[in-house]
Amino acid sequence: HLVSKPKTTVNTNVQSGKQTWTNPQHREMYKTMYDEYHKLRSGANVCHSCRFLDGIKKRYKFKTLLDAGCGTAVMVRKLRQSGVDARGIEAASLPLKEYASDLLANGTVFSTPMQEIPFKSESFDMITSVEVFEHIPEADIDRSINELSRVAKPGANAFITVGQSTSRFDTADGRKKSAVAQISTKFKFHETVKPRQWWLDTFCAHGWFADDDAYMHMVKTSNEGGLSRPPPRGWFSLTKGKPNGKPCKCKVPPGRQASWFCGVGRPNAKKDVAKLWSDLKKEASA
């Protein structure tokens, strides 16, 4: 009942050296790369999201949830077993085929990039996405967040984590060099590594605002060492709706330098998102 496949518009005019999932050739190369990556990890049925599950359930009230970048869909299964109407999307096809073929068959999860989420608008009151956005090319970030906004209900919450460093598969030393040699596609694994303030500016431009209380709750319940460890730069607790206070401003934890924890922002985020919305309207009417 939630599924509504959107009209797909493919942009084939991609600048040289600028990879994007909306380019059909690049899309197939990315899917191949991540399937090969899954094989390198011996098809491990891991759940990166599960460490956050208790914190999410304690903090947020939700009946419907989308896990964007659900991997092998372990968290989706756990949530459904607890009565939540949880769904998932995953750009790589192999993890779902190996570990979630039943969920693929019944339309609970889909193998699709975040730019083309096959669910109706305003379907979910909770969004999760753990260690996914750094894998998305920068040219596709705004389209991805725009799709999350489309399927999220007004007032929905989101918990998103974004990697803040170069992937070990983007280096070439020792064991890593051997692993990289087995991957035929030479795109980066971590395409978009940006400072915390850049992400806050980007989310805010799309109407997602930081919830500092929820963020600290997640740090306390899900960060190894809890509040005794520095708050992670790449964790974001967000609410879709009207801003409260200064939700786009990065708050620096005690003992940390703003240049390290927050970094440089994205001053043109609102302008870039406004252009995207204009382009999407043109595509829809074409």
Task: Describe the residue ranges of each PLM region.
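Conserved beta-strand signature within the Rossmann-like core of class I S-adenosyl-L-methionine
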Residues: 155-163
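A short acidic, helix-capping loop that chelates divalent metal ions and anchors anionic groups
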Residues: 168-170, 182-183
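Active-site-proximal loop/turn and secondary-structure-junction residues that shape catalytic pockets
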Residues: 132, 164
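A short His-aromatic
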Residues: 135-136
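Short beta-strand-to-coil "C-cap" segments at the C-terminal boundary of structured domains/repeats
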Residues: 238-243
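A structural motif corresponding to the C-terminal end of an alpha-helix
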Residues: 202, 206-209
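A short glycine-rich, Lys/Arg-flanked "PGG" loop and its adjoining helix->strand segment in the class I
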Residues: 142-156
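Conserved N-terminal segment of class I S-adenosyl-L-methionine
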Residues: 1-120, 126-130, 139-145, 174-178, ...
